[in-house]
């Protein structure tokens, strides 16, 4: 199979004031905000409704209901597994060319008629501003579709085997035998789409459980995939609780893989559950997960102060710090802080927090009440600690929306609680170190947290940067030099980390797709032996 279709990154729309793009998105936002959508399960292409329902709300106006989604129970899970089994019989044998045609069509739909719908749903249900929605729900997911199709073709075209005379050796890239369980997070619509679609592209079937706090954009994605031509049952859509959906799925003998993004604790529970049931499965399940992070910024004394201030504000506070890659701890030399502090605080003071409908708001609301309570507990802890000082923010209000102002903590303790634990909110903790302690500080960066997802080092001293790159080899799966630790782009920076941050299977790369295939080696012999005797058996 060959193709001349080379993927390119989707251009990011700017949505500047007065532009048609901005006006159209605002119209779609207002239209969807005025509706209350009923969201069914999708099993075998059919809408399924249940007695138990959950609500889609605006985090920035949590009394405003956007939709009611039906929740799966034991019966619906059983139906979905059976639907997946039946769909697998046909889909697993569907030629790659037909599969890529469907997902390239999905990319075209998202580039065009579905773009405003998916972006607006993301803004409304996840409280993302227009730019954050655009780079996620539109551009990144379009890139996932297009680049994954190219990578899948590259995989299938790869036949590296030697074939001696009279023999033909080949590799067959089969899908897994069974179904993949895709468990998706609230924070990225693109990841929510990619987790079931990447295995499906490789010929697998998937059961998709979206995060309950972000069902709305996921529902529109499954509708868009249907329009793109995805056959019924290839991806079954099952909103519901973790226990009612996850427990029966994870113990089913036909489970062939798990594609997960979420908390480290949940991923560890999944892994333990699979381990306890390992003798039940028809095949060993592939386990792919991207989990938590405690992402760092290490500044060298040679750093440009303006660049550092911008990286800190964007890296820590875009999308309210609810990115697995968000900067959460920073190590700043004391002599840099003297110059940085006023610039950083002045810039931070200009940051506006509010509804994404107001395009001048840089930050919006955190996702839900549980997140709000968890994040503010860390702020309260810092306020009451002799080892910490809050120098910005520290204020919050959940009366209308779950709003938390960008909060900066200075600590004298490099092992302070907010330096070690994942907060997943707009809280950045800074530890000031003496420039002479550069080497010791690299050790702190490496050893303070169990995570190893992203991190950045900033400075103009090339020798120091090279030394940090070597010393922090296993501290981050995505390592940024003179840039914030967020914003990985498909086709440019494959994303993932190790240690407590996941299996580092690099979403948006060929490496991830290889987890969803089971290779068969085929040897065809044209001159088959007819005598068992080898020459060495001859008598002297």
What are these regions (language model features)?
Residues 58, 70, 134-137, 184-185, ...:
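Active-site proximal loops enriched in glycine and acidic residues that flank catalytic Cys/His/Asp
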Residues 49-51, 57, 62-156, 442, ...:
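Glycine-rich loop-to-alpha-helix module at the N-terminal edge of alpha/beta enzyme cores
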Residues 63, 99, 122, 203, ...:
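Residue-level signal for inorganic ion chemistry
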Residues 1-65:
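Hydrophobic face of amphipathic alpha-helices that form TPR/SEL1-like repeat modules
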Residues 2-4, 10-14, 61-67, 86, ...:
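Conserved C-terminal structural/oligomerization subdomain of aldehyde/semialdehyde dehydrogenase
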Residues 123, 142, 152-307, 504:
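Rossmann-like NAD(P) dinucleotide-binding subdomain of oxidoreductase/dehydrogenase enzymes
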Residues 129, 165, 206-209, 294-298, ...:
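Short beta-alpha connecting loops at secondary-structure transitions
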């Amino acid at each position: 199979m060959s193709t001349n279709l080379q993927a390119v990154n989707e251009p990011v729309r700017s949505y500047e004031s007065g532009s048609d793009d901005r006006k159209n998105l605002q119209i779609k936002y207002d239209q969807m905000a005025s509706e209350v959508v009923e969201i069914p399960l999708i099993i075998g292409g059919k809408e399924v409704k249940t007695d138990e329902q959950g609500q889609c709300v605006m985090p920035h106006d949590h009394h405003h209901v956007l939709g009611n989604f039906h929740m799966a129970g034991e019966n619906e899970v059983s139906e979905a597994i059976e639907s997946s089994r039946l769909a697998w019989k046909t889909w697993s044998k569907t030629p790659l060319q037909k599969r890529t045609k469907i997902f390239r069509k999905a990319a075209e739909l998202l580039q065009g008629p579905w773009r405003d719908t998916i972006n607006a749903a993301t803004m409304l249900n996840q409280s993302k501003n227009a730019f954050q929605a655009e780079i996620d729900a539109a551009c990144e997911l379009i890139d996932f579709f297009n680049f994954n199709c190219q990578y899948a073709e590259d995989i299938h075209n790869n036949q590296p085997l030697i074939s001696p005379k009279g023999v033909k050796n080949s590799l067959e890239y089969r899908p897994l035998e069974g179904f993949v369980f895709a468990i998706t997070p609230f924070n990225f619509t693109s990841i929510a789409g990619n987790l079931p679609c990447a295995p499906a592209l490789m010929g697998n079937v998937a059961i998709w459980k979206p995060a309950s706090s972000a069902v709305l954009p996921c529902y529109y994605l499954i509708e868009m995939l249907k329009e793109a031509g995805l056959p019924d049952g290839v991806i079954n859509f099952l909103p519901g609780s973790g226990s009612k959906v996850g427990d029966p799925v994870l113990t089913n003998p036909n489970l062939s893989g798990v594609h997960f993004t979420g908390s480290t604790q949940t991923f560890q529970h999944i892994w333990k559950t699979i381990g306890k049931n390992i003798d039940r499965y028809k095949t060993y399940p592939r386990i792919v997960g991207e989990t938590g992070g405690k992402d760092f910024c290490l500044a060298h004394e040679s750093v440009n102060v303006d660049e550092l201030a911008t990286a800190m504000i964007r890296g820590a506070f875009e999308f309210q710090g609810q990115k697995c890659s968000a900067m959460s701890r920073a190590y700043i030399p004391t002599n840099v802080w003297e110059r940085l502090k006023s610039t950083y605080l002045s810039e931070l003071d200009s940051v506006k927090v509010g509804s994404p409908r107001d395009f001048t708001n840089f930050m919006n609301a955190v996702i839900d009440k549980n997140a709000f309570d968890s994040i503010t507990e860390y702020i309260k802890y810092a306020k009451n600690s002799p080892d910490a000082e809050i120098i910005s923010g520290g204020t919050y209000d959940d009366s209308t929306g779950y709003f938390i102002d960008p909060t900066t903590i200075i600590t004298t303790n490099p092992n302070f609680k907010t330096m070690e634990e994942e907060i997943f909110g707009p809280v950045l903790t800074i530890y000031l170190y003496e420039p002479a302690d550069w080497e010791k500080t690299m050790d702190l960066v490496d050893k303070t947290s169990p995570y190893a997802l992203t991190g950045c080092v900033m400075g103009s001293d090339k020798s120091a940067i090279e030394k940090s790159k070597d010393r922090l080899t296993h501290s981050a799966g995505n390592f940024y030099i003179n840039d914030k630790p967020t914003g990985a782009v498909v086709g440019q920076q494959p994303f993932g980390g190790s240690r407590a941050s996941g299996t580092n299977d690099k979403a948006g790369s060929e490496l991830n797709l290889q987890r969803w295939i089971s290779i068969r080696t085929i040897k065809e012999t044209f001159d088959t032996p007819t005598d068992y005797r080898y020459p060495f058996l001859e008598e002297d």
